[in-house]
Amino acid sequence: MAKPKKGAKVNNPNRKSRNQKVLQTIADLQKRIDEYDPATDEQSISQFKHLPISEGTYKGLLENNFVSLTDIQKKAIPVALKSEDVMGTARTGSGKTLAFLVPVIEKLIRENITEYDGLAALIVSPTRELAVQTFEVLTKIGKYNSFSAGLVTGGKDVKYEKERISRMNILIGTPGRISQHLNEAVGMETSNLQVLVLDEADRCLDMGFRKQIDNILGHLPVTRQTLLFSATQSDNVKDLARLSLVNPKRVGVSSDQEVSSIPESLEQYYIKISLASKMDVLWSFLKSHLKSKILVFFSSSKQVQFAYEAFRRLQPGISLLKLYGRHKQTSRLETTMKFSRAQHACLFATDIVARGLDFPAIDWVVQVDCPEDAATYVHRVGRAARFGRQGKSLLMLAPSEEEGMVKRLEAHKISLKMMNIKQKNKKVISPQLQSLCFQDPELKNLGQRAFISYMKSVHIQKDKDIFKVEELPAAEYAKALGLPGTPNINIKNGAGNKDKKNMSRELLALQKPEKQKSDSEKVRTKYDRMFERQNQTVLSKNYLNMAAGDDSGSEDDFMSVKRKDHIIKDEELPDLSVPVSKRQSKKALSKKASLKSKGNPTKLIFDDEGVTHHLYEFEDEEDFKSRGDAKLQKAEFVSKENEAMSKADVDDKATAREKRQEKKRRWKEQERLAREQDEFSGSEDEAHTVTLAGADIDRDMDYGRSSEDEQPPSKKPKWFEQEKPKKKKVDIVEVEEPETLEDLEALTAKLIGS
């Protein structure tokens, strides 16, 4: 068989038949969609298999246990499959994510989009966590389709994303990063875009992304299909819908209905407590719900950090996590995954997790700080009781916030049950917090910044019927946080601070006047560098500013405009008495002179419960009389002391009895040792033995021996050559049997001499 020439086309019948099969499947799918009427067939569909969707999409849904349709999915998916614009509104946790992901996948399948067709679907989410969650759901249900999907969020490498963004068919991201790529990325072509999805549109507008969304809409073709989903329908959302949607179909909650309703399986409670008792109540709540999954909301990130660090040191017995906007992206994702997989845990968070995130099986949602409006309350409590599960919520309200907030919620048909706290179950932790702040300056600094950020968050709220900063007990709240005093707060004009906070750094730099040069552009002399030197052993600049009352640091939760030029007149300077001689200057710096201005020293001690006391505490006469009659106090004191002495007497008698027994044991032991020593000394005396015997002929007869017969003395063996140890020699004195008196006298003399 001859080989085909190089460059000649090769007809592959299998490939051609496969393409024809795909086209036939798409045509059949389009025919089913055209014949489908959402108005008449809505009552007959209850599962995904009843929808005109492809086999691959249905298989991916079935593998992830997505079988039945929710209300919003039943109304939105059929309309979106017919390529019409949709404006969907539904309660939180109702399944809005699948309501737009399924139509997006089916739209790309019917248009026969491949990896060479570029960007075909764009999904905009308000937060990074929600974008990541949407991307994960897309990869699960779309695993049997050949589309390429990408995720672009803040906190990642922009250059890395630009190199690969041109090959994506579906792009999911946050408004800021998508707008940046549309302006800067060369390969990001949007002329072939088929679908645009705006998820949690109201949240995007509340977070200040209106300009970014307008920029995104300006880059997209007019012929696209737009799906807008939101939990509430505010005026801003309606304005956005008029600009981005063409003859939209409204599904879910109608436009004349109130704020999104609360899930029916959610139990809602609120308690009325003072601002100073919130930390105590939160601690008591955690200690009594150790086998629960709890989500705690604060109004600022500094409060989240302080509560996390303080409770972590106190060890409540449950896993603690924290999540706020200034976290790094990797840390935020890690925290989100840990809390999702945990069975019993507590997450301290800001409103960054109040929208769209699906944490499974949350038992309690606790709002330590009052939400800014009813919509924020709805989104916070919507993290629990999702998809028909059971859940509970608890709202802590200060006395100045109760009346106004309850009225706002009742106006939106949200009723709360009031809960009373049993004082015996309430645990006070302010002494422990005070002890921790005394031992750790960093925790004290966090507490000061948490106090300031909370006061500022209350001050900038628009609803002054609820948020009354002048009625808050600042001194008591600072004491409850464990602070030694009330920090100084410089609240400046907050108008435009939110816009400045959400504005990019490049635009903020362009708005500055040209005369105000940055410190890096100024020429610094040798003397400038000398005065700018700082000792390396001092605390951080941020902490020093806090100690001095300057709370306008760059890491604060709110931006404030600082004054650049400080003009101080000469008459405003204080008249200081400067020493004129070395002797006077040395005397002024002496310890004796410094003690005059400092006053008397004070020393504090901590008891076992962490409460501070002065080293010497005396009771006044008035305090003594206020406790009752002196004779009754005397009798009570004497009875208490007698009872204490009787208890101590029993212990003393037992101690004395043990001492006597021990003394008796030692005396017996000494007697035993003395007796053994006497027996040992007696055995040594018996070693000298006297033997009485008769005449010894061999000894008495002295045989003459020649020198030849004498043997030389043998060599003394070494200590290691001796086979047996030498025994102690016994002195034996042998004498003949005495016969006369002279023999007895000689024997006696010999014994005495030996």
Curated annotation (Swiss-Prot):
Gene3D superfamilies: P-loop containing nucleotide triphosphate hydrolases. A motif (Q motif) lies at residues 46-74. Pfam families: CTE_SPB4, DEAD, Helicase_C. ATP binds at A90, R91, T92, G93, S94, G95, K96, T97. One of its GO terms (biological process) is rRNA processing. GO terms for cellular component: nucleolus; small-subunit processome. Residues 77-251 form the Helicase ATP-binding domain. Residues 1-22, 575-604, 638-731 are annotated as: Disordered. Keywords: ATP-binding, Helicase, Hydrolase, Nucleotide-binding, Nucleus, Ribosome biogenesis, RNA-binding, rRNA processing. It comes from the Eukaryota. Residues 583-595 have a biased composition (Basic residues). The keyword Ribosomal protein does not apply. Interacts with the U3 and U14 snoRNAs. Associates with pre-ribosomal complexes. The Q motif is unique to and characteristic of the DEAD box family of RNA helicases and controls ATP binding and hydrolysis. This is ATP-dependent RNA helicase DBP4.
